[in-house]
Amino acid sequence: HESRGVNCSPNNIIVGAGDEYLLMLLDQLLCDAHGGALSYAMENPAYRKAYFVLKGIGRRVCPIPLDEYGMSCRKLRENNVNVAYVTPSHQYPMGIVMSIGRRMELLTWAGESDDRYIVEDDYDSEFRYRGKPIPALQGLDKNGKVIYIGTFSKSIAPGLRMSYMVLPDRLMDSYMRVGKRYSNTVSRIDQNIVNLFIKEGYYE
């Protein structure tokens, strides 16, 4: 919360071995919560691994063009999709920082329907050449429509395959039903090491 403005409790944080695993798990949670598969919008160009994960599990994925402020909300509205996958801190691969105005537009879009969500991939928000980072999109969300995904692979070590997902309360019941089917993909040892690393203040 202190560095990114993310609002959550420990129970809302789901740990997994990489963003791709968490994205597949999230898709199952959304299917459970809404009784069927949802469709996705992705920035164009986009993080290709995430694109191929969603296409590989049979989801409809609509590429949405960018402008100087990030994903075009006008183009997003022209496509009948449920989930917008965005990289607002540093758009991958173009590096665009999504403006506050565009973030609010996205939140408005998501709030217009119960089955709309935003996946915020905050993969490298810790790195900046100048200025303070804009707070995470999740921290601006008042309706529980943003799923925040972060990773320690960029900020600590590439060999540490540990990512995390912050679920809104509205998806926690689905996680309790679906998530318990799977073993955790990150060892308890690695989790405890990172926990101690953060608690001792070395991550700041």
Regions found by a protein language model. Give the residues of each.
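Conserved core of the PLP fold type I
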Residues: H1-D114, E126, K132-L140
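Generic structural signal for secondary-structure transition and capping sites
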Residues: S89, D115, K145, Y202-Y203
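Walker B catalytic acidic pair
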Residues: D121-D122
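Flexible, active-site-adjacent loop/turn segments at secondary-structure boundaries
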Residues: S125-F127, P135-Q138, G150, K154, ...
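Short aromatic-enriched loop/helix-cap "lid" or pocket-rim segments at secondary-structure transitions
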Residues: Y129-K132, G159-R161
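PLP-dependent aminotransferase class I/II
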Residues: V146-E204
